[in-house]
């Protein structure tokens, strides 16, 4: 995503908040598959979003990340940390961490949500538990429905309760 593309999108319909749900693609759906995206896909795209936000006076971005990024790394179960460090998933975690560092330093308001293991469900009534940025206490097999994540992203965009934080969420 080039800065010129983001500018065109902003010119067409100026947002008040930007929600970013990028994920770096892999060669297959397997989490162990080789990455096919540039190493900084998410960081560079978010940098372009932040640059356009500053140009157009947009103050807030809400970014989908993953449990284990940033401060939550130390509270990710040790088996999962080993998996994330030694598999091809490490590239995405590196990219997420670069995104976090750069967005935090940019001066824009942000919410970086870190759901635990994503699952499919049609149940729109599942409660969402919000954990602190460090994710201390999140159970090993905790999961978050994609539907819950989508709902939470919109709620975070519309409110201010989670501004300038990076909470972990689960169902």
Question: What are the functions of these language-model segments?
Answer:
Residues 25, 38-39, 55-56, 60, ...:
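Oxidoreductase cofactor-interface core, primarily capturing Rossmann-like NAD(P)-dependent enzymes
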Residues 1-48, 52-55:
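NAD(P)H-binding glycine-rich loop region in Rossmannoid oxidoreductase-like domains
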């Amino acid at each position: 995503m080039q800065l010129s593309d983001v500018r065109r999108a902003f010119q067409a319909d100026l947002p008040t908040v930007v929600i970013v749900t990028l994920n770096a693609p892999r060669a297959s759906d397997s989490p162990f598959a080789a990455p096919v995206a540039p190493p900084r896909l998410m960081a560079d795209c978010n940098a372009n979003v932040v640059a356009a936000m500053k140009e157009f006076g947009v103050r807030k971005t809400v970014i989908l990340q993953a449990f284990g990024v940033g401060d939550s790394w130390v509270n990710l179960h040790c088996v999962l940390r080993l998996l994330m460090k030694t598999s091809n998933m490490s590239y995405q975690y590196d990219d997420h961490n670069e995104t976090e560092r750069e967005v935090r330093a940019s001066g824009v308001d942000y919410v970086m949500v870190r759901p635990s293991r994503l699952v499919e469900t049609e149940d729109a009534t599942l409660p969402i538990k919000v954990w602190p940025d460090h994710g201390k206490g999140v159970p090993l097999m905790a999961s978050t429905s994609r539907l819950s994540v989508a709902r939470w992203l919109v709620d975070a965009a519309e409110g201010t309760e989670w501004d300038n934080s990076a909470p972990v969420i689960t169902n």
